Amino acid sequence: MVYKYHFEPIPSEWLSDPVLSRTEPLVLQILANRGFKTAAEVSDVLFPDFSAVIKAVGLKDMDKLVERLSRALNGHEKIVVYHDYDVDGICGCTIMVENLRRMGGDVEFYANDRLVDGFGMCPNGVEQIMKRWPETRVILTVDNGIVAFDGVEAANKLGVDVLITDHHEPGAALPSAYAVVDARRKDETYPFRDFCGAGLALKAMSALARRLRRDVSEVCRSADMAALAAVSDVVPLHGENRTIVHEGTRVLTNGDRPAIRALNTVKNVARVTAHGTVAFTYAPMINAVSRMGQDTRHVINFLMEPDEGKCRKTALWLDEVNEQRKAETAREEDISQKMLAEENNPDPECIVLYNDSFKEGIVGIVAGRLKNRYNVPVIVFAPREPGLIKASARSVPGLNLIETLMMLPEYTVKCGGHAAAAGLTIQKADFDAFKDAFTKLCHDRNDISKNNVSPPLDAIVDSSELNEEFVRSLSALEPFGEGFPEPLFGLTADIDEVRFMGQGQKHVKYMDTRHNVSIIEWGGGDKARAKAEPPCRFVGHLELNEFNGNVSVQMIADQGKK
């Protein structure tokens, strides 16, 4: 793989700015290379203003939503939060429930059984709510509802007001709800569109607190949940999202929530980062619950639980469920690789798979990993009800997934999602025809990114330049995530020692002992053994390795890409 590096001089405006002039030159250089132009843009990245996000108003129907919730609180009406079962829906529900209850609300929460009703507010869900809580007067959705025409109509017939907060793409029309808050509405003029569901929940609760003249800082304590959701849902980290994740990561680091402290203890978390801890520790453990067919109510109660002992017990259970999820994921990945080997197509334009043993809650992970490995659109189906199969789909730059799937209405029983990720249901008998049709659409769209596309380097360094201070300065750029990745470095090093690690010695560590720098390449053992001499150039991300009081610089190399 060929990596490109573009050097852009640091603008003089930045260097004369009284605040930016005190910022590490490396940090400014990375931002200049990434195309930032003005001092104001850079200040927004480095010093996000969370108060501005909380105060920002203007989303359509937000006033109506707040007015109805205010009336429900004052009239002691039952409110039920109808949430999705993924991290975004769970965290968004937590934000709403804990804040509404803090404001005196009579609040319950409900999510579909993903194996029965799938995604989104539906008539059966409304029926279940009314059976459990027949006094319900308001249903407040989070992370779903924008295409829930039947579900909203079912609630309307029962005299229940529906307040929708969602971030998915709407259709040509909106459901006939009391209020519909979605920054992606066709008639929306709000300047920011890329919220996750929990981000909208945070804005809704802050708007409600202002209307009721409550302390908005109480709502701000829920920023940790909005950050967790934003990272998990892979929304772009720019604008208000970046500010929310920045503040939420700070709250997570403080450990204000007993549930987070319990997760940190169980998983031995020393430092919380959005791109590390949130993405690869918290989010998978929370997502595993619904993926493995467990009740998400346990997770929401856990996130709001004040008792340390109960939190630790639930954290251990979450860890156990996640280990089961990992085992099932590995099994389905192995089957997928065998199926692809049987197809004998080393350079597929897309991947479409189905297996009777796949689980609906796991295929999204498998699709994502296959997409990352082959860099093509991937759709993986699992059995649904008799005669139907349901898939999770993941795409690459160049193919808008939801637009492409909408071009196949003759096959899709149900379909929804985004440009990069979608879910769909088809008749099992149509699988082969659907696969052929989708493959043809991918073939016709020659703008799909292929494997020769590489991310740009942020800087090129020599091992002699690296030290603890250098690496720590990069934390000023956090949080990292979608649209604002962790800095990628080109590194030149004088390797004088090579060590093989892990089961089967399949990993390799290259060491420049003179400069106390090491480079780890996961899965690179066989490639390293095949070379007569170790490489001297690497590409990867820098971090500090702290062990027994000693600190050294470590690069995690892009796998096989040097």
Regions found by a protein language model. Give the residues of each.
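Beta-strand/loop nucleic-acid-binding surfaces
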Residues: 514-530
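Histidine/acidic-residue-rich, glycine-tolerant segments that coordinate divalent metal ions
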Residues: 142-195
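OB-fold single-stranded nucleic acid-binding module
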Residues: 430-435, 527, 531-562
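Hydrophobic helix-and-loop "lid/oligomerization" segment in the mid-to-C-terminal part
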Residues: 2, 8-138, 158, 209-433, ...
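Accessory interdomain/linker segments of ATP-dependent helicases and helicase-like nucleic-acid enzymes
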Residues: 459-517
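Short, acidic/hydrophobic/Gly-rich beta-strand patch recurrent on exposed beta strands
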Residues: 353, 509-513, 554-558
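Short alpha-helices
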Residues: 95, 174-214, 219-231
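A common structural junction motif
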Residues: 409-414, 440-447
